[in-house]
Each structure stands twice: as structure tokens, then as C-alpha cells.
Amino acid sequence: HQKEELGYGIYKGVITSIELEKMIKTDSIVNVNGDKPKQITFLQCVGSRDEKSGNHYCSKVCCVTAVKQAIEIKKILPETDVYVFYMDLRMWGQGFEEMYRTAQEKYGVNFVRGRISEAAATYDNRVQIKAEDTLMGLPLNLNTDLLVLMVGMCASEGTKQLAKSAGIDGLYGFAQSKSEHLYDNFTEQDGLFVAGACKRPSSVNDTIQDARAAAVNILNSI
């Protein structure tokens, strides 16, 4: 809701990655009119790495999620054109860079380095996009059935309140560990440990591994 120019909550064809995931799981990827979409466009870094939203950090999981969802769309709807607008693709983790290449070479997903500046509705319930290809230095005008906003991760209100009351609140409302590199599960409060996405944006796998590390550190401290 901090990116009004993209039309979320105003135009029905503008959805979030979370809403698209529900469509994929139920095999119900349709446009506003209930038809199979001819084109779906992703926009990366919505609410992350953004001066306007105040979140300067990378949310880590968005790039991988967009590529995964783009592939799933092409598997279900091979005739649908899929575009991904990005600033930088950060494919964290083993095998994800290969997945990015597979999306291009096997499934024909179109990756465009650039930003979408504005979105508006068309008479036939599609979404008109004004964008720029920053590699080519060219303005772009596209009509797409669905504009998918890859929303970032932020600290929940519960995390902010708990971290503040415990005296371990850090940047952007996340819990602050003692040292991100050496004592990442420890805090400045003795006996208080942290793990997972309460510290920073984190994938499910990273969160599980971090929780295991925290459990070991707790046992060692007893």
C-alpha cells in the first residue's frame, strides 16, 4: 500500500506474489475476466531496497520466488507470456542460478532489467504499464493481464514490540543479535537467543537451519 502508483488495491489486475501463490496451488490462474491470461508481468523489489518505503535492505527471497513462480506459470499455461522486471537478480542459494537460466532457456521467461513507474487499468480490465528498459535505455508501454508485485519481508508488529520490550530492537524493527557474523543467535541480554526471520528476511530453509543452531547454543549455555 506504500506504492500507490502501482495500483494495488485499486486495480483488480494488480496482485501480490502471495495471492499468485494461492492461484498456482489451486490451479486457478485467471485474469480479472476469469480467462486464461495472455501475459503476466512480475515486478521485483516492491517494498525492499526502496527509499520511499523506508526499507533499504534486500528481502532475499523475492528473486528466487519470482523465478519459481514464473516457471510454474509456464508449466501450467505454456502459451502465456511471462515478463520479470528487476533491478538486480539475487539468486541466493545452491541451484538457484541454474533455475534462473532454466527459466530463460527452457521456459522462455523474459527478464527485463528496469523499473515500472506507473500502472493503470484499461477498458478491457487489463493493466497498462509504463516502464523503462535500463539496459537498452528505452521506454516501454505494455498491457498485461496480471501485474504481480513481489512484496518484501518486514518485521511484524509482534516482532517489533517483543524486541523493543526485551531491549534487543535493531534496524527496521527486527531483533538485533550480538554479532551477525560470530554470535548471530546471541543477544546483548544474557539468556536471550534469537533465530530466523525475527532478525532479518530469511528463507524457510535458512530459518530452520538457524533455529537448529540456536538450539545448540542454548544447550551449550545451560
What is each of the regions a protein language model found here?
Residues 1-222:
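Residues forming the flavin
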